Amino acid sequence: MRRFVTLLIALLCLSATAVQAQVEIRAPGQQTIAVANTQLVPLSGTPLPAIAAELHDVMAADLELSGLFRQLDPAAFLDDARRPGLTSSRVDFNQWALLGAEILIKGGYQLQGERLLVDFRLYDVVHRRLLTGRRYAGLRRDVRTMAHKFADQVLKSVTGREGPFSSRIAYIDNRTGHKELYLMDTDGANALRLTDHRSIVLNPDFSPNGREVIYTSYRRGNPDLYRKQLSTGQEARLAFKKGLNIAARFRPDGREIALTQSATGNPELMLLGTDGSRRRRLTSHWGIDVDPSWSPAGDRLAFVSDRQGNPHIFVMDLLGGQTARLTANGKYNATPAWSPDGKRIAFTRLEKGVFDIYTVRPDGTDERRLTFGPGNKEHPRWSPDSRFLVYSSDQDGRKGIYIMRADGTGIRRISAGGGQCQHPAWSGQR
């Protein structure tokens, strides 16, 4: 497994409230924040244009995806952008202000053998001061992770919420001829195959701490539930009752797993311990109950049931036992995903032979359609900060993994290669 970058030093982190007093926070689609994203300069030794360009380009792509920033043309940048020195006293704030910059990203790097040291700084141009800084140390191969991590900090500095760019996405890819589990960065880089079951693997989900992934595999002929430790690669079979053991989801506190099993003859929602031991049966109904998704507090479950004829989204209160139908429209609603901030539930709906993605409040109000156009858009999952959704789509003719903002804008395909990709899951922060 790819080694995580070590964060050595956190420098002068200002509070979110201080930053909000300097830069008005705008939602995607509203007036954006003007950012000068400069290429990092060598702290010592020979300039390495490839490293500088990669750090800059990864950061630029992350900031563009957020929808919060307007990036100034680097061709207009000053000599100040190429000067060494990262203290506020070395920044020509007057000249950056004349260019229209509201915030400024500068930094430096140093490569010694395979060891890479990167310093980032984020400045408030309007008030002429440092907002935040980070120093990262790792290997040359960690350069993209370092840029993602600082992009997370840029979002935190201007919104109060850390970005999701250094998290990861699990998904299913059949590039080998079999549906196997893969892992990639949020921009599609560093794709890594996690299983070699030579069978069908489906429905991955990350543990809340991001250290494990659970998934269903037909490796032994039955759809059994497996768990894999990402740091060691160790795999264990958790649930293997005859029939279905599918669509498993970790409870937000990481102590239990909800899934669908059909050992009783009818697909029902069950609650298991993380060791696979059965805790209790959650549903007992003639209809099919599948695709559970936890509320952030872990006290409610959204799920799909055809108990009223057609597949619809329902919400179950685990404390009181009451169940209420969430979706009022459409004849086929599926794959609910509760946002980490608790404000919205994403799901797919089949209309006129095509699946599209919608969101709705947990009380069933304010339904919004997010996707349009040709092709199916399925299996939505939220980013850990609730700003984005990842999903699978065949809109380009071949199933791939896509990311979009929570309002449906900024659609970007992130998967590559010749396989058909589906069933994405988004990890928490790392």
UniProtKB/Swiss-Prot annotation:
Any GO CC annotation of this UniProt entry? periplasmic space
Q: Which SUPFAM superfamilies match?
A: TolB, N-terminal domain, Tricorn protease N-terminal domain
One GO biological process this protein is involved in is:
protein import
Q: Print the keywords alphabetically.
A: Cell cycle, Cell division, Periplasm, Signal
Mainly resides where? periplasm
Q: Among its keywords, does the record have Signal?
A: yes
Quaternary arrangement and interactors, per the entry? The Tol-Pal system is composed of five core proteins: the inner membrane proteins TolA, TolQ and TolR, the periplasmic protein TolB and the outer membrane protein Pal. They form a network linking the inner and outer membranes and the peptidoglycan layer.
Family to which the UniProt record says this protein belongs:
Belongs to the TolB family.
Q: Tell me the protein's name.
A: Tol-Pal system protein TolB
